[in-house]
Design a protein with these regions (language model features):
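Intrinsically disordered, flexible peripheral segments
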Residues: 1-162
């Protein structure tokens, strides 16, 4: 994965490594396709993640149309700066499976968007899908880490058979 930024103080744009999926092999054997995002770090500012497939030139001014390979957005309500004591925002990894308390508020997030129609259209011409996420910061985020907004563990395409 590659992260780039064109202007100073503009959030870096996330560009994934290619995801390989041969849509032609599947034909119409699936009824739904989701783009999943695992391990999203939401300790920074709130933002909209605008998602484009096979358009690594997308930026915050790119129109959100299928012609521009826009497939949807996800929204992160960011935690922002921590004003707690030392260790306050550290996520404990040694929780007991019998611990009934809610997980730590900064536990990495998961989200998905359904991209069935867009995937079928884009997949007619390629087996490689590069995901570009353009972060658009919510207002009032001054003073936070505005550059390295998108941090995540994994992106994958999931299809559901009929």
């Amino acid at each position: 994965m590659k992260i780039s930024s064109k202007k100073k103080n503009e959030p870096k744009i996330f560009v994934s490594k290619p995801l390989i999926l041969d849509i032609k092999k599947f034909g119409h054997s699936f009824y739904r396709a989701d783009l999943e995002f695992w391990g999203i770090d939401h300790s920074g500012p709130s933002y909209e993640g605008r998602i484009f497939i096979n358009n690594n030139k997308a930026n915050s001014k790119t129109r959100m149309t299928i012609k521009n390979s826009y497939v949807g957005s996800y929204f992160i309500f960011g935690h922002g700066k921590c004003f707690g004591d030392i260790g306050h925002c550290e996520i404990r990894k040694d929780r007991s499976p019998y611990d009934l308390r809610p997980s730590h508020p900064l536990t990495p997030a998961y989200t998905y968007i359904t991209i069935t129609d867009q995937l079928l259209k884009i997949g007619k011409n390629t087996t490689e899908f590069v995901v570009t996420i353009v972060p658009v910061l919510a207002s009032g985020t001054l003073g936070e880490d505005e550059e390295d907004v998108i941090k995540l563990d994994k992106i994958q395409i999931i299809t559901y058979n009929k």
